[in-house]
A protein has these predicted regions:
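Active-site-adjacent structural elements in enzyme catalytic cores
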Residues: 1-174
Length: 176
């Protein structure tokens, strides 16, 4: 696992995502494990690393509401406005899923958790990647989420393809 610093080598992390790799990076809440949500191979690898059931579903993060435009098409105008409205804190939304979200992301749910990230590293990853990425807590099932780079190493060692350096922040959850 190579360490990278934002934004100098961000393109290398994106190349890993495009090759169906798995990366670790800081988010608003804890360290995240991420991959391309359209790659079933990459998503299943994340789930294996975490020993997590596919039935639970995964969260997606994006750099802006535009990255979720196709998902928002079926929402009523008021719900769209609430989602698009600027918030002081990063907020996780549970949005009804549609055919743009693969079943390995939604699990046994008819909704998907999405967040517009404000974290500079996570936002940069989504911007350069050009679409949302998977963002699940960086921990094996039953262990507390990693809150430091050393904890990420302790949990996963060299099992990750890339490690993006940085610091974590905090977030909120709203159900629509």
């Amino acid at each position: 696992m190579k360490a990278i610093e934002y934004p100098k080598l961000l393109a290398s992390a994106i190349a890993v995502l495009k090759r169906q790799g798995v990366i670790s990076y800081p988010t608003e809440g804890v360290w995240g494990l991420g991959c391309d949500p359209m790659s079933e191979v990459a998503v299943r690898r994340v789930l294996r690393l975490k020993n997590r059931s596919i039935s639970k579903g995964l969260i997606l993060i994006g750099s802006s509401h535009q990255q979720f435009a196709r998902l928002l098409e079926d929402l009523d105008d008021q719900s769209k406005r609430r989602f698009i409205e600027k918030r002081s804190k990063p907020t996780t939304w549970l949005v009804p899923s549609n055919d743009t979200i693969p079943p390995w992301i939604t699990g046994n749910h008819d909704s998907v958790a999405v967040r517009i990230t404000k974290h500079p590293v996570a936002k940069g990853l989504c911007e350069v990647f050009g679409r949302p990425i998977v963002s699940t807590s960086c921990n094996p099932q039953g262990a507390p989420p990693a809150t430091s780079q050393s904890q990420v190493q302790e949990y996963f060692g060299d099992k990750l393809d890339y490690f993006v350096m940085g610091e974590v922040e905090r977030l909120s959850l709203i159900h629509i």
